[in-house]
A protein has these predicted regions:
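N-terminal type II signal-anchor transmembrane helix
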Residues: 2-49
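Short alpha-helical segments used as structural interaction elements across diverse proteins
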Residues: 5-9, 13, 75, 158, ...
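A structural signal for short, hydrophobic/glycine-enriched beta-strand patches
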Residues: 34-191
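A general structural signal for short secondary-structure boundary/capping elements
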Residues: 101-106, 174-177, 196-204, 219-222
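A transmembrane-helix-recognition feature enriched in membrane-embedded lipid enzymes
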Residues: 188-213
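The feature marks non-catalytic terminal segments
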Residues: 210-222
Length: 222
């Protein structure tokens, strides 16, 4: 039997299928982002004076310098926010959680030194060297560092994801929003990445994802 499908019809069919896939993916991204953002409502704070006291603050890690070797403003603002909370008496201890998968790359130690330079005593800072992802940092805060409640410290969009994870892992979390970075080109890039990260975290929670490492319990402030 002769195939009557023309190249034009095939292209049209392919475009329809691609269009449906794009719409479906956009819907998934939208639903997941609304779900995460909704979960964080009422738990985000901008002003030090308004945020309730929590014994422990969890500082989420990032690289101190960007790909060009320049200071990373996301990092700088997070350190400043964490120090503000400590000096205002809003937290008594800080867990600095980040990536240390290579000896020469140590986010927690960099954060510790930055906080000490901002006047935070070394004795109140605890390092989580296996905070490879936000998911790992939040779960380890409860399972390894023994916390039932915590103040998360990062930028607003990052905090939303962290609070969502906490709420689904039995950790009562509020968040203090560090200043964001006002660079339009970077804003678009980081927000696009964050939208996709929120989809991933919804799937991680739904499918019972576990951190890469747990380990022995660490007592904070004892």
């Amino acid at each position: 039997m002769k195939n009557t499908t023309t190249p034009k019809k095939r292209r049209k069919t392919i475009l329809w299928i691609l269009g449906i896939c794009i719409v479906a993916m956009a819907m998934v991204v939208g639903v997941c982002n609304r779900k995460v953002n909704k979960c964080a409502e009422g738990r985000m704070y901008q002003n030090v004076s308004e945020i309730p006291y929590r014994r422990v603050g969890l500082v989420l890690g990032t690289t101190p310098k960007n790909a060009k070797g320049n200071p990373n403003l996301y990092y700088r603002y997070r350190m400043k926010a964490a120090a503000q909370l400590y000096h205002a008496g809003k937290v008594s201890y800080l867990i600095v959680s980040g990536d240390n998968h290579k000896r020469e790359y140590n986010e927690p130690e960099c954060m510790r030194q930055s906080l000490i330079a901002l006047g935070v005593p070394d004795s109140v800072i605890y390092s989580d060297f296996a905070g490879f992802r936000t998911f790992d940092s939040m779960v380890r805060c409860k399972e390894v560092f023994g916390q039932d409640s915590v103040t998360v410290i990062s930028q607003r969009w990052h905090n939303q994801r962290a609070v969502y994870i906490a709420q689904h892992k039995g950790l009562d979390a509020i968040a203090y929003n560090a200043n964001d970075v006002d660079m339009k080109w970077w804003y678009v890039k980081s927000r696009t990445r964050e939208m996709l990260a929120k989809v991933k975290v919804v799937l991680d929670v739904a499918f019972g994802k576990q951190p890469k490492f747990l380990g022995e319990p660490v007592a904070v402030g004892r």
